[in-house]
C-alpha cells in the first residue's frame, strides 16, 4: 500500500489516456508543487467524483482510479498551472484520507487479469470497428443538431462532449482495450465501469453491451 496525492474529477482517465488540466485551486497548486519536488516521475492519482463538484471539496469519490504521470507543466502565473498528464496504470483505492492539505488516498496498483487471453487481439479488432461506427454515428447526429441540442446529446451519452478526432489504438491488446474505452462516445459512469472491469476480456464484453445502448440512442436521434 502507498499514500498518493489524488485529483478527483468529473471525468475518467484511463491508462494510455491524456489528461490536460488547468490548475487554479490553492490546494491543487500545492499538490502539483509537491509532486514535482518528489523523487521519481511526478505523478498523482485521478479518480471519478460520483456526487458533488470538482472545486471546493465535499465531493463523493469512487474507489478505482488511474495514476497520471505529468508530461508537461507550465506555471501560467503565480496562481495557475497548465499541465498535461498521461494515464499509466490502474489503482485500487483502499481508503480516502483527510484532505490535508489536498486529497490523498491509500492505494494499491491493480493490474488486469487474463492479459494473455486467447483471441484477445481479434476481439480488440472487432470492438475497434464498433467504436469507430459509434463515433461516426455520434458525429452524424452532432452535425444535424444546433448548439443546444448538442448539449442534450452529450447529456444523453453521459454528459461528455462528443470526440470526433483521431481513433487509432495501441498495438498492445491490453492497452488497446483502455484506448477503446477512452474513444467510445460514452459518459463517465460507463467509462468508470470499463476501468473497473477485472481484465481485458470483461472490458470488451462490457463495452459491447454499452455500445448496444449508445447505438440505439443515436439511431433513434437520426430516425
Which residues fall in each region the model found?
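N-terminal low-complexity, acidic/polar interaction/targeting segments
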Residues: 1-223
Amino acid at each position: 500500500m502507498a499514500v498518493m496525492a489524488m485529483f478527483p474529477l468529473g471525468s475518467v482517465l484511463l491508462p494510455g489516456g491524456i489528461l490536460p488540466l488547468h490548475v487554479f485551486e490553492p490546494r491543487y497548486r500545492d499538490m502539483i508543487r509537491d509532486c514535482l519536488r518528489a523523487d521519481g516521475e511526478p505523478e498523482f492519482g485521478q479518480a471519478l467524483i460520483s456526487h458533488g463538484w470538482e472545486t471546493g471539496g465535499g465531493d463523493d469519490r469512487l474507489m478505482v482510479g488511474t495514476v497520471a504521470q505529468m508530461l508537461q507543466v507550465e506555471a501560467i502565473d503565480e496562481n495557475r498551472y497548465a499541465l498535461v498528464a498521461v494515464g499509466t496504470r490502474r489503482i485500487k483505492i483502499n481508503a480516502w484520507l483527510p484532505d490535508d492539505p489536498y486529497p490523498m488516498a491509500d492505494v494499491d496498483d491493480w493490474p488486469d487479469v487474463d492479459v494473455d487471453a486467447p483471441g484477445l487481439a481479434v476481439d480488440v479488432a472487432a470492438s475497434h470497428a464498433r467504436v469507430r461506427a459509434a463515433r461516426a454515428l455520434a458525429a452524424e447526429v452532432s452535425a444535424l443538431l444546433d448548439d443546444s441540442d448538442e448539449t442534450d446529446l452529450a447529456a444523453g451519452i453521459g454528459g461528455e462532449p462528443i470526440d470526433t478526432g483521431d481513433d487509432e489504438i495501441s498495438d498492445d491488446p491490453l492497452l488497446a482495450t483502455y484506448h477503446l474505452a477512452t474513444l467510445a462516445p460514452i459518459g463517465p459512469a460507463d467509462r468508470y465501469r470499463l476501468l473497473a472491469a477485472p481484465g481485458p476480456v470483461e472490458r470488451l464484453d462490457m463495452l459491447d453491451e454499452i455500445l448496444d445502448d449508445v447505438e440505439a440512442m443515436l439511431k433513434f436521434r437520426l430516425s
